[in-house]
Amino acid sequence: MAAEPNKTEIQTLFKRLRAVPTNKACFDCGAKNPSWASITYGVFLCIDCSGVHRSLGVHLSFIRSTELDSNWNWFQLRCMQVGGNANATAFFRQHGCTANDANTKYNSRAAQMYREKIRQLGSAALARHGTDLWIDNMSSAVPNHSPEKKDSDFFTEHTQPPAWDAPPLSLQGPSSQPRLQRAVAWHSRSMAPTQTCLAPHPKPHWNWKSSIIGKKKPAAAKKGLGAKKGLGAQKVSSQSFSEIERQAQVAEKLREQQAADAKKQAEESMVASMRLAYQELQIDRKKEEKKLQNLEGKKREQAERLGMGLVSRSSVSHSVLSEMQVIEQETPVSAKSSRSQLDLFDDVGTFASGPPKYKDNPFSLGESFGSRWDTDAAWGMDRVEEKEPEVTISSIRPISERATNRREVENRSSGLESSEARQKFAGAKAISSDMFFGREVDAEYEARSRLQQLSGSSAISSSDLFGDMDGAHGAGSVSLGNVLPTADIAQFKQGVKSVAGKMAVLANGVMNSLQDRYGSY
């Protein structure tokens, strides 16, 4: 088996191959200085296109780096030598493959044929030349396409002496005779000015100068973009502004009209859908009415009560499927609303959670509360004559700060009415916390407290002792004393009286302010 090429041979070979002008650009995208190669096609690629080829798979394209990889074998080098970007471009163009997409291009019939051709040429070159670095076509063709011969500078070619170019021209044979004749003619013209340097008009000298620089000047001495019309600044007239404004107004009107049309169409579609839905509801309601007519009386009543029917029901306020009716609000007959006794708990704001409820006339709260507590027949409780604490405006607290818990009410009311507690327990030798805060519910304590209250009386009766003074309440009557414990009733009564006093103070202050402000009128 032949020895593998070393790193020096690989670098020398690729330096010669990359010197070919067509191999200086990527075969797919045309990027300069490609450093990767596809052995399958013998072409040079950039790093981006090499990634695309790598994604195609090794069965379509085998990628190697011309600078980093050093494990090339002779067959791979022969494939690169017999290939090249120029040969691949000509083959693909000849077979009508002009696609830019890599997947389409390298899966085509032309790519398959070119892969087979490169493999056959590489195998033939390997069998013929073995481990020789160069092959015949490269030794004869590559120097002719070297950049030193083809990409020569124009000024260097005409300013340097032609001695270096004459020997190669003389060795080319009959095919280079016209070029040799041109070189000899140019040499004779260049020597003419030196022989006639004293002539009054050295025309050959000036002609030679004009052929070197004069022909290049017109291409280099191009003016700027000022000569081209339509690219510079133009004067704007008032007519152009008016035209632009008119176009903007027309566009704005068109947009408004389109928006109005769209809105109208949306409304029409919505009305049509609502009308259709209402018709469907009516049809369903009629069907349900027919079903309910077949039921018996009791079953029909149960169906209506449970919401199983769609007919109008007296016990149900409203149904979605029933006919729509306009509900008008009626004006209340009297300013004072009739409420039950339990609504009084919500008015005070002490035992109810949430916002307090008020009557229509806030100034009548004090009177109504006072009248309720003063009439013993209304509540069926004993009225105890106690000294009311002094109520001021500063002692009124906001509704949001009022307590919503019974224990908080007891603590706060006992703290605010400390003077009343002193008067109440002034003659007692010892008291407990339950007695002080009103939490004692024992019957013995109730009896003792009543005895202390009636200690100064000359005579007492059973109705005074047990809280049934008038005996107006029969066995079947319901009073607040039957609902709440006695201690809670007393505490609640005291709280209501306090609130009534505060409201009275507020009403008095409002009336005084009104009299002070409007009294002079």
UniProtKB/Swiss-Prot annotation:
Subunit structure, as described in the record: Interacts with the coatomer complex. Interacts with the C-terminal appendage domain of COPG1.
Domain of life: Eukaryota
UniProt subcellular location: Cytoplasm; Golgi apparatus membrane
Membrane topology annotation: Peripheral membrane protein
GO MF annotation terms: GTPase activator activity; zinc ion binding
Modification type N-acetylalanine: residues: A2
Alphabetical list of Gene3D superfamilies matching this protein: Arf GTPase activating protein
Keywords: Acetylation, Coiled coil, Cytoplasm, ER-Golgi transport, Golgi apparatus, GTPase activation, Membrane, Metal-binding, Phosphoprotein, Protein transport, Transport, Zinc, Zinc-finger
Cellular component, GO, one term: Golgi membrane
Domain Arf-GAP, first and last residues per copy: 11-127
Stated name of the protein: ADP-ribosylation factor GTPase-activating protein 2
Any Pfam family matching the protein: ArfGap
InterPro entries linked: ARFGAP/RecO, ArfGAP_dom, ArfGAP_dom_sf
Matches recorded under SUPFAM superfamilies: ArfGap/RecO-like zinc finger
Main location as per UniProt: cytoplasm
Zn finger limits (C4-type): 26-49
Residues bearing the modification Phosphoserine: S140, S146, S237, S240, S312, S334, S340, S364, S368, S432, S433, S513
Region spans: Required for interaction with coatomer: 97-521
CDD domains: ArfGap_ArfGap2 (cd09029)
Biological process, per Gene Ontology: COPI coating of Golgi vesicle; protein transport
